[in-house]
UniProtKB/Swiss-Prot annotation:
Pfam families: MrpF_PhaF
Activity regulation note: Na(+) extrusion is completely inhibited by the H(+) conductor carbonyl cyanide m-chlorophenylhydrazone (CCCP).
Residue stretches spanning the membrane: 5-27, 34-56, 60-82
Family per record: Belongs to the CPA3 antiporters (TC 2.A.63) subunit F family.
Name of the protein described by the UniProt record: Na(+)/H(+) antiporter subunit F1
One GO location term (cellular component): plasma membrane
Biological source species: Staphylococcus aureus
Subunit structure: May form a heterooligomeric complex that consists of seven subunits: mnhA1, mnhB1, mnhC1, mnhD1, mnhE1, mnhF1 and mnhG1.
Compartments where located: Cell membrane
Main location: membrane
Protein purpose: Mnh complex is a Na(+)Li(+)/H(+) antiporter involved in Na(+) and/or Li(+) excretion. Na(+)/H(+) antiport consumes a transmembrane electrical potential, and is thus inferred to be electrogenic. Does not transport K(+), Ca(2+) or Mg(2+).
GO molecular function: sodium:proton antiporter activity
Amino acid sequence: MNHNVIIVIALIIVVISMLAMLIRVVLGPSLADRVVALDAIGLQLMAVIALFSILLNIKYMIVVIMMIGILAFLGTAVFSKFMDKGKVIEHDQNHTD
């Protein structure tokens, strides 16, 4: 079996998985479920880009993959802080600078 066929099959599987996560984003039930589903979609998007870069032999796409990973991590970290404290940026009223 040609390796291109295997990559295309993997792409189809990942895209189907992304559609399932998109349903979770729309239906919920909670905000935390939606954020976790969005994070999973980010990881799956990284996999799709990696598979396309292998299929098309494009080596510089690793930079795009890393940027998506960083943005997904920051989004999850910001949301977890929001869930914990109710706000993202805290202003210290006692700070005298």
